[in-house]
């Protein structure tokens, strides 16, 4: 049986933690930042946990993670 391929889009967007959870970066932080407040931009920093309902789909895209 051939090797399973990892989805490149998922590889770039998600990181699997040692505890088994999946991290993702926040949306709405790329452009059109002038109308967003400093507080809202600060709260978009860093990574957040993927929702449990999406986790199964992401794990299928990352077979070796």
Swiss-Prot record:
GO molecular function, a single term: structural constituent of ribosome
Pfam families in the cross-refs: Ribosomal_L35p
UniProt keyword Cell membrane, yes or no: no
Bias kind Basic residues: ranges: 1-16
Membrane-spanning parts: none
Disulphide bridges: none
GO CC annotation: cytosolic large ribosomal subunit
Key word Ribosomal protein present: yes
Similarity-based family: Belongs to the bacterial ribosomal protein bL35 family.
HAMAP family for the chain: Ribosomal_bL35 (MF_00514)
The protein's name: Large ribosomal subunit protein bL35
